[in-house]
């Protein structure tokens, strides 16, 4: 029996953070894609399937909440966890529409690995 590799998309305009996080997760056996903003995430979601997406809230071009709502229109079952380092009033729009989280920055690798254990 083969086990499926878990696919994660990290969406954050802080590319150093996103790439570091991707490297850590890849070292733990996850297949990781990185998107630089909400619009880039939407393009990834149109062409690929992910088991979970970690989405920053504050980003240029398209913020995380708008990206979440757009992705949910094309992939209603998408699991998207909102990440933020701030108290975000707009976050409630995403949470009430089914987003998971928020995952508050800074978070630990252990926090993420526990979150990923919920992926079936």
Question: What are these model-predicted stretches?
Answer:
Residues 36-40, 63-66:
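Acidic catalytic/metal-coordinating carboxylates
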Residues 56:
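Active-site residues of response regulator receiver
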Residues 66, 86-103, 114:
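Alpha4 helix (beta4-alpha4-beta5 surface) of REC/receiver domains from two-component response regulators
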Residues 1-7, 110-120:
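Non-catalytic signal-transmission and effector/linker regions of two-component phosphorelay proteins
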Residues 59:
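Receiver (REC) domain active-site loop signature in two-component systems and cognate sites
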Residues 43, 65-77:
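Short amphipathic alpha-helix used as the core "switch/output" element in two-component signaling
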Residues 15-33:
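Two-component/phosphorelay signaling modules centered on CheY-like receiver
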């Amino acid at each position: 029996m083969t086990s499926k590799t878990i696919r994660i998309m990290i969406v954050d305009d802080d590319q150093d953070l996103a790439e570091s996080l991707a490297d850590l997760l890849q070292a733990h056996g996850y297949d990781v894609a990185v998107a630089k903003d909400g619009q880039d995430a939407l393009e990834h979601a149109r062409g690929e399937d992910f088991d979970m997406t970690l989405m920053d809230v504050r980003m240029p071009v398209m913020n995380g909440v708008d990206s979440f709502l757009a992705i949910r229109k094309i992939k209603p079952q998408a699991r998207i966890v909102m990440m933020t380092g701030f108290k975000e009033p707009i976050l409630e729009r995403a949470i009430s529409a089914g987003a998971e989280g928020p995952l508050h920055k800074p978070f630990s690798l252990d926090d993420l690995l526990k979150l990923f254990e919920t992926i079936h």
